[in-house]
Amino acid sequence: MKLMNSPLLSIVTLSWDNQPYTEAFVKSIRENTTLPYELIIVDNGSAPETQRWVQEVADRALIFAENQGFPGGFNQGAALADGKYLLMANNDTEFPPHWDVRLVETIEKYPNAGIVTPAYTSGRKSALRFEPGDGIKIIGRFRKYPSGVAFFMRKEQFHHVFGGWSMEYAVASGEDADLCFTVWKKGYEIVVDERVLVIHEGKVTSQSKLADWRVHFRANSRQFKRKWFYYFYFPYLARMTTPRHRKAFERV
């Protein structure tokens, strides 16, 4: 059900050519979303024919002549959102029936959830990253974090508590881990809804269009580890709850 006047969900994705993947994403959203929603597509400098297509199929389209990057594109798309909840998903994903109802159920059941993510599999490697099942799983803080394949969040919390996506990272990776660590540092949890299995091709855009992808990846990895050094290397200390330890980590 699409209801532009008062959407419950704002679904945001990025486009940078690779139109067939975005078409499959849009098809899965249109066919499998039952709650009121709006679809926002941010085009990061695609060819003119792809940009025209984006304007035709999106409920709201943001068209840029140059690539704004992953965090920049999602931040600008989220700024347009009218929904109570945000789904920020890669354009090389496909969503199953009932995904929206189940993710809303989960985020409303867990008021301390900062991010709800579905289970997902890589279409290229046929390897599950978070296995599907019947339950809900809370990820241990400052440990294994989910990739930013599909983050489902409360819009106001995303903007005003977590501050959106960090702009410290280049176009390859790192911003999803940064947002997860920010959520944990603010005292919230990351929850996996195993009932929703999303098909994800995996780095279709970045690896196909960036000749120096690995260079960016290594630079972003160094930036992330510098910023989150104590949380990354000493997670057991970060999970301590004594006032003295909390005060020490607040200074990081």
What are these regions (language model features)?
Residues 27-36:
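Short, acidic, metal-binding catalytic loop of nucleotide-sugar glycosyltransferases
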Residues 64-81:
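Glycine-rich, basic loop-to-helix element that forms the pyrophosphate-binding segment
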Residues 86:
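Short aromatic/hydrophobic "clamp" motif used to bind/position activated sugar donors
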Residues 93-129:
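Conserved donor NDP-sugar-binding/catalytic core segment of glycosyltransferases
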Residues 94, 143-145, 159-199:
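Donor nucleotide-sugar recognition loop
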Residues 121, 192-211:
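Active-site donor/metal-binding and catalytic loop motifs
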Residues 122, 134-156, 172:
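A recurrent flexible, glycine/aromatic-enriched loop bordering the glycosyltransferase active site
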